[in-house]
Amino acid sequence: MKVIFLQDVKGQGKKGEVKDLSEGYVRNFLLPKKLVKEATDSNVKTLDAQKRSEDKRKEQEKLDAQELGKKLEELTVKVTGKAGEGGRLFGAISSKQVAQALEDQYKIKVDKRKLEMDAIRALGVTQIKVKLHNEVTVTLKVHVVEE
């Protein structure tokens, strides 16, 4: 019996997959637990439409990330911190502070977890990586100045 998986089933298939399974297993176990549905023509067409819309949504997310990445590469974020002799900071500049400064200065919201950086401990310009999407990583300049 052909079925469409509604959820991942260990050892059988992944969500959205169409597979031929034994009728008893499907009727007695998978259907009552709503893990699968029968692969009728209308259900298969619905699944294809869902896959197409999901692909379109993912492509749009990637394009949005690339557009934001172009903006970020041109910017320099200015962050202030207290410093001692030799340009060493008291404490450090964290990803949270950089994300907040980016939002305050340029009205661009970026999640602090997308900033791939170690804590900044010195004055000057530092380049950090920003992972906006699985396939889109850009470099952002952070200029740390003394208060």
Swiss-Prot record:
Residues 44-63 are annotated as: Disordered. One of its GO terms (biological process) is translation. Binds to the 23S rRNA. InterPro entries: Ribosomal_bL9 (IPR000244), Ribosomal_bL9/RNase_H1_N (IPR009027), Ribosomal_bL9_bac/chp (IPR020594), Ribosomal_bL9_C (IPR020069), Ribosomal_bL9_C_sf (IPR036791), Ribosomal_bL9_N (IPR020070), Ribosomal_bL9_N_sf (IPR036935). It comes from the Bacteria. Keywords: Ribonucleoprotein, Ribosomal protein, RNA-binding, rRNA-binding. This is Large ribosomal subunit protein bL9. HAMAP family: Ribosomal_bL9. The keyword rRNA-binding applies. Residues 48-63 have a biased composition (Basic and acidic residues). The gene is rplI. Gene3D superfamilies: Ribosomal protein L9, C-terminal domain, Ribosomal protein L9, N-terminal domain. One of its GO terms (molecular function) is rRNA binding. Belongs to the bacterial ribosomal protein bL9 family. GO terms for cellular component: ribonucleoprotein complex; ribosome.
